[in-house]
């Protein structure tokens, strides 16, 4: 990926701004490319993350494919001065108007579970519990996508597995993996939420993870 930039002076530093945008450290061409100007992000319990990020750049005509599928971290300064991080994956991107020197871009960001909406399937799971099925689906997606493997996982450490017995068969019928997982969780009374960071320590400004 080679992004040609128009030199009109560097974009302002985001280090002292109320909200900041970070890409994976390996995405060097994206570092400093966009300056976050406005954000509208919604987080739902037993739902997910969906946000729109409005950015400016000194580069016009950047291929939107450079953004799609890329994990990122948005950090916001709270009223106590602490930083709150939200991690997600870019699922859509648009280029807006340009005055010849500055261009505008809008990114749509969602959580990894929402990405699982892209596969619709019909299958039967035999002699598996709800937790087994969820782990199987997540493992399949993390195996087939290096991006997902590096940017999200599921934590079931606070769930008592003994409360969810093995079922003779469980049917997924013409529904996405994400909707199937949500349906199973609601049926079993399992709540979930999306949280930035993994079970191990990591710098979210270098390695977005949720």
PLM regions: where:
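Amphipathic alpha-helical and helix-coil boundary elements used as assembly
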Residues: 1-210
């Amino acid at each position: 990926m080679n992004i040609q930039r128009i030199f009109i002076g560097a974009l302002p530093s985001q280090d002292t701004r109320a909200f900041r945008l970070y890409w994976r450290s390996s995405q060097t061409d994206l570092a400093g490319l966009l300056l976050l100007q406005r954000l509208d992000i919604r987080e739902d319990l037993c739902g997910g993350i969906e946000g729109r990020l409005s950015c400016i750049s000194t580069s016009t005509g950047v291929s939107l494919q450079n953004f799609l599928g890329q994990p990122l971290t948005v950090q916001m300064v709270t009223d106590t001065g602490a930083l709150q991080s939200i991690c997600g994956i870019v699922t859509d991107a648009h280029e807006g108007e340009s005055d010849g020197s500055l261009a505008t871009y809008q990114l749509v960001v969602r959580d990894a579970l929402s990405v699982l909406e892209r596969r619709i399937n019909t299958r039967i799971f035999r002699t598996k519990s709800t937790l087994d099925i969820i782990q199987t689906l997540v493992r399949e997606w993390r195996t087939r996508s290096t991006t997902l493997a590096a940017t999200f996982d599921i934590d079931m450490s606070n769930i008592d597995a003994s409360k969810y017995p093995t079922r003779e068969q469980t049917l997924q019928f013409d529904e996405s993996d994400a909707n199937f997982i949500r349906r199973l969780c609601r049926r079993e009374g399992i709540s979930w939420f999306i949280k930035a960071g993994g079970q191990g320590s990591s710098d979210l400004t270098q390695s977005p993870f949720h």
